[in-house]
Amino acid sequence: MADKKQVVKYGDVSQRVGVEVISARGVDVPKLIKMLIANAAAEFASTYYYYTILRMHLAGHEDYKEICEDARLEDRAHWELIVPRIYELGGELPNDLKAFHDQAGCVAAKLPDPPTTVNILTLLLESERCAIRSWMEICDITFGKDPRTYDMASRILNEEIEHEAWFIELLAHERDGKSIPSGHFRRGTPGEAPYSKNSHFYNP
């Protein structure tokens, strides 16, 4: 017997049960899609692209470059993970890169002036902190209501928290001469993304 609360009709391809069930549990799906697009733009346009430039300018610090590369590639992995979820929910990406960039939930991590190591590490740290806040918000609104999005967001959040710890360690050492251990090492493989990654993207 069909559930009386059922909205999607037999054979109907204009609606999605995957949306129906989370809407019934209180998820504002249009708002969630908007938030996911903002986070996708932040992961790809605000961080992955600009982290490429920041990494290049960490001149003379190969160890710092490796950590930045891990964060850069993992942000790309996050982008790859978010996009399918946007479409599953019935959303879509803007068909214009500038329009997409302008929706980013975090400020673009543009090369600072002057591009000193301390300024770059500070920018990297604050970018990761913005990501943590953004993903925590999505975890909050999907917990107990949308397990698919919550699982994805919590996996990404785990890695963003690790990234923050990395850049705290590096910045404290470089700027303040202090030891504030992150509690873990760089990845075994660049961009390994142990919590979120679904395929390899390393392209040196």
List each language-model region with its residue ranges:
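Iron-associated oxidoreductase/ferritin-like identity signal
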Residues: 1-204
